Amino acid sequence: MKNRMKKGSSMITLIVVIVLVVALCVGAYFLVSSLYEKKLNQNGDVNNNSSQDNTQDTSKNDEEEISSEPLYTLDNYPKVDASLATQPLTNAFIKNFVGEDVDVSKLDYTNTHPGYVRLINDEVDLIVVTEPSKEELELAKQKGVELEVIPVVKEGFVFYVNSNNKVDYLTKDQIQGIYSGEITNWKEVGGEDMEIKPFQRPTNSGSQTGMLSLVMKDKKLMDPLKENLVSTMAQIINFVSSYENGKNSIGYSYYYYATTMYEGIDKEIASNIKLIGIDGVKPNAKTIQNGSYPYTTAYYIVINKADDENSPSRKLANLMLSKRGQQVAKNAGYVPVK
């Protein structure tokens, strides 16, 4: 009897041990499987994140990097002319497309109107300037030349006053009123009681063409007093910035010249003028880029429309408008069109 009980007890013990071992094995299996699956998921997440990071980095590099592989030599680079405000742009193009060691001081530039004359007379292949004036379009017509005008960078036509002037904003109607002679005192537009001295530029200058087409449009621009007609953009800035003589003055130019370019010429004088906001919008790179600044315009590539796709002018124009060309323009401080 005792032996039977002993054997029964041993059997029960064995069964319990087997059950425990099986339970431990099953538990261990599920634990290991769970840990393994979790590890796989973690690795997958890490790999996915790494892939995304690499993609983002590559995309940033694509935006920032500019190829500097030479595409021309100085001898075969097309003949180019430019206005004063676009010469830094054309210099940047030639440095990138030919090579950084180009001595741009030796390039043969004139200015806006002479540049148009040279293009119409087939003395240059391409010009980078403001839009053509009525006189320049008429000259081209007389010579049997049709001009093709292509925006290359965005630009803003700006008005500026002495930094001590209390007026910060004007409306488009007020600007027209000042330059038509209907508004003659700053108190009429929220300023001090002093006569307005509006400077102008000569006919066929880039600034004057912009003033007529962008600002005055169908409204007649008043004839300027002799002392208010100034031959260069720099001279107007000098006059307006003067504490004694410029407090009541207003002038106009293009955003790039009035900011980036002139600050490089004389930072102290540039600090004595301020740009006027138009219809509540101040001119800056952002408002010019998105078009919210009312007098947003462009600088243009101008070529002979008869030039074919393989011509030096059209090949260079296409390169200036390419991703590489637009990045060159942006790095030079201009607002790209693309």
Q: In which residue ranges do the predicted regions lie?
A:
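Exported/periplasmic ABC-transporter solute-binding proteins
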Residues: S9-L139, V145-E155, V161-K338
